Amino acid sequence: MISVTLLCVVIISYFHYNQLPIYDLDLALKFIKNSTQKEDFKSLAEKLGYSEDDKLLVIHADDLGLEKSVNSTSFESLKKNSVSSASVIMTTNNIDEVANFSELNPTLDLGVHLTVTSEWKIHKWGGVLDDKDIPSLLNDNNQFYWNKRKFTKFSNLVEVRNELQAQIDLAVSMGINVSHIDSHEGALFFDPDIFKMYLNLAKKNDLLAFVPIQASVHFDENFPKPDHAIIFDQFFMAEAGIKPDDMEKYYLDISWI
């Protein structure tokens, strides 16, 4: 029989390998078992007036603002309706393009891609706020940490809240018609206190909050799901390791689900 110590080592190794910043054993087990199922919540389809068996597809483009090429491709896809919605990283150098595009296309579904990590090798950024106001979120180069574990380990909750609110405020001040928030790399979905803060920010700003079904393990009798938290029954994203030439096949292969 597997020992408790060995089980803990296996669990810790699993989360470390997958860069999942979960340090509470009970919560870790919930994530592993995926103990919260879509049946626990009224489906998004039902909320929109469809039957629970109807399948709705949302094709979402995040990381707007990352690079001019990302912007131009995403803008074209949004205008052609091949992409349903998109969200903007407000800590990058190309957000003016997004603001201009939003002004010309005010009915588009655009959100703020709340960002607290900087994982790219050639694209690095810090926060919207001054470095002195968010020291716990920054490395020695005054940039966000490159992975979610370090962010979760070192971040101060007040500084996180202030930075995320500043990102929303900046988007609104630039004329972006913000409809929702989501989380870059899912960094805000693991720590219970940070996750609650994420949902509270959505409520405070009268925005919808994207929640993948995996993150709904946080909800229980002491923390019921708020109405503005929109749970997606299934969530698919091409992960690292999938070659560019294989992207089309990846998405076509999930189309039958």
Identify the meaning behind each predicted range.
Residues F154-I230, G241-E248:
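Catalytic domains of cell-wall/extracellular-matrix polysaccharide-remodeling enzymes
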Residues I59-A61, V83-A86, R149-V158, H184-L188:
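Second-shell loop/turn segments in exported
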Residues S43-I59, L66, L129-D130, I134, ...:
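C-terminal active-site subregion of NodB/CE4 polysaccharide deacetylases
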Residues S3-V58, S69:
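N-terminal pre-catalytic segment of deacetylase/amide-hydrolase enzymes
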Residues T107-L164:
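Substrate-binding cleft of extracellular glycoside hydrolase catalytic domains
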Residues L44-K121:
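Active-site beta->alpha N-cap acidic-glycine motif
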Residues L64, T91, H113-E119, H184-G186, ...:
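Active-site beta-loop-alpha junctions enriched in small/polar residues
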Residues G49, S74-K80, D96-D109, G126-N139, ...:
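Acidic (Asp/Glu)-rich catalytic clusters
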